[in-house]
């Protein structure tokens, strides 16, 4: 289903938080939504890989990389792992790489910027902890909705049937 964050903001204005417009879309899917799983890490993607090995249907991985864009936290290998395990999308408060391939994969990916340098693979960080960036606090189990216009957050699953009316 295509997500329209503008329409969701109009319908659910009192139930959503809007993330500051600092993200760009780098995946092959322009809109996605799901229940948040968070990873907090810095220039290391080993923990990200561990989480992406889990079943991801209905889930979006939200990565707090501290806003650092010196090393890419997501590359084609991790994006393919996410796709293989059914993840709906990935949002990275940090960088990604290998855009030529990322944009062909059937998964939503939003991040701050691209850079060719990869992250190390240490499993350092935290999983399912509240993270704050873009002017909002993301709690595990919240729902995130993303499209080319922006990213919004809700503590509850929104009724997307409202978009079809």
UniProtKB/Swiss-Prot annotation:
<comment type="similarity">
    <text>Belongs to the RraA family.</text>
</comment>
<dbReference type="GO" id="GO:0060698">
    <property type="term" value="F:endoribonuclease inhibitor activity"/>
</dbReference>
<dbReference type="GO" id="GO:0051252">
    <property type="term" value="P:regulation of RNA metabolic process"/>
</dbReference>
<protein>
    <recommendedName>
        <fullName>Regulator of ribonuclease activity A</fullName>
    </recommendedName>
</protein>
<comment type="subunit">
    <text>Homotrimer. Binds to both RNA-binding sites in the C-terminal region of Rne and to RhlB.</text>
</comment>
<dbReference type="InterPro" id="IPR036704">
    <property type="entry name" value="RraA/RraA-like_sf"/>
</dbReference>
<dbReference type="Pfam" id="PF03737">
    <property type="entry name" value="RraA-like"/>
</dbReference>
<dbReference type="InterPro" id="IPR010203">
    <property type="entry name" value="RraA"/>
</dbReference>
<keyword id="KW-0963">Cytoplasm</keyword>
<dbReference type="GO" id="GO:0019899">
    <property type="term" value="F:enzyme binding"/>
</dbReference>
<dbReference type="InterPro" id="IPR014339">
    <property type="entry name" value="RraA_gpbac"/>
</dbReference>
<dbReference type="GO" id="GO:0005737">
    <property type="term" value="C:cytoplasm"/>
</dbReference>
<comment type="function">
    <text>Globally modulates RNA abundance by binding to RNase E (Rne) and regulating its endonucleolytic activity. Can modulate Rne action in a substrate-dependent manner by altering the composition of the degradosome. Modulates RNA-binding and helicase activities of the degradosome.</text>
</comment>
<dbReference type="InterPro" id="IPR005493">
    <property type="entry name" value="RraA/RraA-like"/>
</dbReference>
């Amino acid at each position: 289903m295509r997500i329209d964050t503008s329409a969701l903001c109009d319908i659910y204005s009192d139930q959503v938080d809007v993330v500051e417009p600092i993200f760009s879309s780098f995946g092959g899917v322009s809109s996605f939504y799901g229940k948040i799983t968070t990873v907090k890490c810095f220039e290391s993607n080993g923990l990200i890989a561990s989480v992406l090995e889990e079943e991801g249907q209905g889930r979006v991985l939200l990565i707090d990389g501290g806003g650092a864009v010196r090393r890419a936290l997501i590359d084609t290998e991790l994006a393919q792992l996410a796709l293989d395990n059914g993840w709906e999308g990935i949002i990275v408060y940090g960088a990604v790489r290998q855009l030529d391939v990322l944009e062909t994969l059937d998964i939503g990916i939003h991040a701050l910027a691209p850079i060719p340098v990869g992250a190390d693979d240490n499993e350092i960080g935290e999983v399912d902890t509240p993270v704050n960036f873009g002017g909002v606090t993301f709690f595990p189990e919240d729902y995130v909705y993303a499209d080319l216009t922006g990213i919004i957050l809700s503590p509850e699953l929104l009724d997307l049937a409202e978009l079809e009316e």
